[in-house]
């Protein structure tokens, strides 16, 4: 039997085929739509959205882009696919609902070198080793008891800071540099105790690393272009710096071992353990029953985290708190009144004296809302998942714009104003409880939340209390305005150092 082109059978058959194909195509389109990436700004060939970040503060640009593209948007940063969360709901999805799926950190080549191939806690991939490191920090290095044991170091160093400011005799001082130096000294004594080493050289090397690792680097954005490692020149410099740091830290560790073997005591104040002592005890078996390799390189990687992370975050927070109070003198007056009434002429101020300074704590909370230590939290997707119906592939970088969330008028009335009283009802916490809103994330959330909150706050509360108790403050040259420009980069630092004049409070 033959069927002609015009026969009803051929027509019906073709119709069925057309319908079947149409249904298949429609299903693929619908399926594809349900697995699309979040919306985002238009992208250029090869570089994607990189052109939109030139010369700008990244988290500010991301806030502006989110206002046009939504609270979850997609960016193409060279070869890197990234999503950006700019609302509490999206932040909660990444750090709580899908916390395990986003438990990794992005690969940063500069930090791979100086952390001994990610042996540190900050950038090590989530897994057994990382969980053991978290255990070390939570149960040994940064317990509340351990942080309190270092209080004499903080009290001595901040007392010296007051003396240094007094010696300026009313001349302009660079408070930013003084705070950084003071905090550096505290962190190094906490870590290394009484062991002598090339402190200034070591601090300079750490600062060089932070400068080389900051911002978006071509080697991270175009990982398949290996020649960029050579052209950018960063890798060679970092290996040179790591070699110098190795020599310093190996000597410090050897001296700790020798002292412990000889005296049976720690290298800290009054024979107590410093951070290196604790890590060496853990290496030798300790009390934690670890099931991971743990040697010199592991110790050095963790020391890098503590020193690099602890110094900048605390000193920057004090910098911004003083800056905001200079712009809001009524806040400074209220804080000074509380402190001076509480201390009532007391000459030596100790950490125990500041525990009930409620308004000072509100000032710090408000400072961290406007100027979070890590304005962009970085995660990486390790298991494919969906957020709001959007498909997120494995390897996608995730940025949580903490800076933008803390300034969103939908959650914060008068968000650009410095109003410590907004925290008076204890609605917001540094740690996230089960039902807590995610509008406030100065230390992150979830598995990757900062383990050093109490240590960091201790290095902010006491110096602020002392600065406000002992001195009255004014801007140099009779200025009435203060430049609050933020530095270009991923950290929330002031672009210009804070210069102030202090007069002793009689």
From Swiss-Prot:
User: Per UniProt, where does heme bind?
Assistant: 450
User: What are the record's GO terms for cellular component?
Assistant: endoplasmic reticulum membrane
Keyword annotations for this protein, in alphabetical order, are: Alkaloid metabolism, Endoplasmic reticulum, Heme, Iron, Membrane, Metal-binding, Monooxygenase, Oxidoreductase, Transmembrane, Transmembrane helix
Question: What other comment is given for this protein?
Answer: The CYP71D1V2 product is either trapped by the reductase T3R to form vindorosine and vindoline precursors, or it spontaneously rearranges to form a member of the eburnamine class of monoterpene indole alkaloids.
Q: What InterPro entries does the record tag this protein with?
A: CYP450_71D, Cyt_P450, Cyt_P450_CS, Cyt_P450_E_grp-I, Cyt_P450_sf
Q: What is its EC number?
A: 1.14.14.50
**Per its record, what triggers expression of this gene product?**
Up-regulated by herbivory.
- What tissue specificity is annotated for this entry? Expressed in leaf epidermis.
What metabolic or biological pathway is this protein involved in?
A: Alkaloid biosynthesis; vindoline biosynthesis
Name the family. Answer: Belongs to the cytochrome P450 family.
Q: How does it sit in the membrane?
A: Single-pass membrane protein
Gene3D superfamilies associated with the record: Cytochrome P450 (1.10.630.10)
Obligatory cofactor(s): heme
Question: For side Lumenal, which residue ranges?
Answer: 1-5
> What is the name listed in the Swiss-Prot or TrEMBL entry for this protein?
Tabersonine 3-oxygenase
Report the transmembrane regions from the record: 6-26
Q: Which reaction does it catalyse?
A: 16-methoxytabersonine + reduced [NADPH--hemoprotein reductase] + O2 = (3R)-1,2-didehydro-3-hydroxy-16-methoxy-2,3-dihydrotabersonine + oxidized [NADPH--hemoprotein reductase] + H2O + H(+); (-)-tabersonine + reduced [NADPH--hemoprotein reductase] + O2 = (3R)-1,2-didehydro-3-hydroxy-2,3-dihydrotabersonine + oxidized [NADPH--hemoprotein reductase] + H2O + H(+)
GO BP annotations listed: alkaloid metabolic process
**Organism name:** Catharanthus roseus
Tell me where in or outside the cell this protein is found. Answer: Endoplasmic reticulum membrane
Task: Give GO terms: molecular function aspect only.
Answer: heme binding; iron ion binding; monooxygenase activity; NAD+ binding; oxidoreductase activity, acting on paired donors, with incorporation or reduction of molecular oxygen
Q: Which residues lie on this side of the membrane: Cytoplasmic?
A: 27-506
Q: Which Pfam families match?
A: p450
Q: What does this protein do?
A: Cytochrome P450 catalyzing the monooxygenation of 16-methoxytabersonine, 16-hydroxytabersonine and tabersonine, but not of 2,3-dihydrotabersonine. Converts the C2,C3 alkene of tabersonine and 16-methoxytabersonine to the epoxides, which then spontaneously open to form the corresponding imine alcohols. Inactive in converting amyrin to ursolic acid.
């Amino acid at each position: 039997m033959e069927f002609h082109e015009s026969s009803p059978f051929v027509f019906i058959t073709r119709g069925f085929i057309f319908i079947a194909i149409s249904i298949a195509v429609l299903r693929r389109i619908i399926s594809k739509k349900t697995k699309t990436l979040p919306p985002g700004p238009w992208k250029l060939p090869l570089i994607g959205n990189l052109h939109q970040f030139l010369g700008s503060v990244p988290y500010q640009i991301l806030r502006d882009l989110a206002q046009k593209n939504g609270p979850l948007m997609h960016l193409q940063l060279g070869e890197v696919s990234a999503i950006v969360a700019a609302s509490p709901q999206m932040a909660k999805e990444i750090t709580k609902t899908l916390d395990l799926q986003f438990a990794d950190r992005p690969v940063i080549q500069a930090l791979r070198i100086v952390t001994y191939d990610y042996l540190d806690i900050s950038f090590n991939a989530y897994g057994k080793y990382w969980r053991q490191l978290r255990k070390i920090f939570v149960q040994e290095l940064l317990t509340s008891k351990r942080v309190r044991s270092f209080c004499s170091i903080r009290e001595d160093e901040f007392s010296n800071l007051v003396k240094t400011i007094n010696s300026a005799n009313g001349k302009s001082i660079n408070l930013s540099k003084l705070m950084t130096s003071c905090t550096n000294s505290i962190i190094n004594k906490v870590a290394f105790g009484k062991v002598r080493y090339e402190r200034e050289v070591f601090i300079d090397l750490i600062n060089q690393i932070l400068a080389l690792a900051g911002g978006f680097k071509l080697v991270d954005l175009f990982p398949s272009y290996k020649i960029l490692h050579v052209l950018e020149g960063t890798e060679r410099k970092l290996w040179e710096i790591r070699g110098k740091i190795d020599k310093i830290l190996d000597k410090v560790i050897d001296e700790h071992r020798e002292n412990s073997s000889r005296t049976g005591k720690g290298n800290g104040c009054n024979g107590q353990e410093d951070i290196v002592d604790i890590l060496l005890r853990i290496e030798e078996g300790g009390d934690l029953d670890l099931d991971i390799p743990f040697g010199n390189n592991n110790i050095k990687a963790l020391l890098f985290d503590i020193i690099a992370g602890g110094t900048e975050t605390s000193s920057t927070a004090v910098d911004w708190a003083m800056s905001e109070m200079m712009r809001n003198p009524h806040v400074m007056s209220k804080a000074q009144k509380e402190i001076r009434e509480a201390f009532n002429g007391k000459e030596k101020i100790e950490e125990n004296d500041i525990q009930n300074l409620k308004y000072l704590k509100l000032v710090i909370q408000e400072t961290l809302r406007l100027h979070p230590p890590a304005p962009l939290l970085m995660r990486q997707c390790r298991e494919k998942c969906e957020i709001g119906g959007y498909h997120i592939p494995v390897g996608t970088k995730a940025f949580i714009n903490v800076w933008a969330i803390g300034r969103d008028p939908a959650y914060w009335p008068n968000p650009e104003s410095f109003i410590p009283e907004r925290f008076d009802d204890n609605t917001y916490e540094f740690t996230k409880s089960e039902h807590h809103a995610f509008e406030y994330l100065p230390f992150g959330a979830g598995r990757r939340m900062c383990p050093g909150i109490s240590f960091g706050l201790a290095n902010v509360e006491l110096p602020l209390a002392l600065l406000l108790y002992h001195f009255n403050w004014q801007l140099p040259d009779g200025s009435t305005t203060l430049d609050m420009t933020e530095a270009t980069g991923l950290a929330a630092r002031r672009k210009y150092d804070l210069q102030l004049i202090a007069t002793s409070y009689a």
